[in-house]
């Protein structure tokens, strides 16, 4: 397994594993125990919460935020982290926000700035706030 290319200013926490060919951009935060597949590309300023599982050949655009807490954990003894999961070959556009527990299916695309509140099916494109599936044009 080759070492990832990690740009200056990135923070990679303890227990993170990388597949071959990963690139972590400037000022990216990769939380504890994240598992990244092969050829994952994470652009400038993205935030990956703890315990995320990211498949192979995933693109994460600049300033993407992945959250794992439905309710703030301060003074909440019932806190349970729910990291998003990204399957193989998906693309997350810049500035998108992935809320706790969502699964992004293989070959799915999340448009820039989308706020993903529910799972995204494989081969689907979602956009907007909240994210909704784009209608497909018949040509």
State each model region's role.
Residues 2:
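A glycine-/small-residue-rich N-terminal strand-loop-strand element
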Residues 6-8, 114:
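Residue-level marker for the onset of beta-strands and adjacent loop->beta junctions
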Residues 8, 13-104, 129-131, 135-138:
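Flexible, glycine/small-residue-enriched loop-and-beta-strand segment within the central core
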Residues 63, 112-113:
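Alpha-helical segments that scaffold the active site and NAD(P)H-binding pocket
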Residues 106-109, 115-117, 122:
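Internal alpha/beta core interface subdomains
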Residues 110, 128:
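Conserved G/P- and acidic residue-centered "switch" motifs that form tight phosphate/ATP-binding loops
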Residues 122-124, 132:
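Glycine-centered loop/turn positions within well-structured domains
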């Amino acid at each position: 397994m080759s070492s990832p290319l990690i740009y200056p200013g990135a923070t990679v926490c303890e227990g993170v594993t990388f597949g071959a060919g990963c690139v972590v951009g400037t000022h990216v935060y990769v939380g504890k125990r994240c598992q990244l597949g092969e050829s994952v590309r994470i652009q400038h300023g993205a935030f990956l919460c703890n315990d995320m599982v990211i498949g192979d050949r995933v693109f994460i655009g600049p300033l993407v935020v992945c959250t794992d807490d439905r309710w703030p954990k301060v003074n909440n003894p019932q806190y349970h982290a729910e990291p998003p999961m990204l399957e193989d070959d998906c693309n997350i556009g810049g500035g998108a926000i992935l809320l706790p527990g969502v699964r992004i299916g293989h070959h799915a695309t999340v448009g820039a700035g989308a706020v993903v509140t529910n799972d995204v099916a494989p081969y689907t494109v979602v956009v907007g706030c909240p994210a909704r599936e784009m209608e497909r044009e018949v040509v």
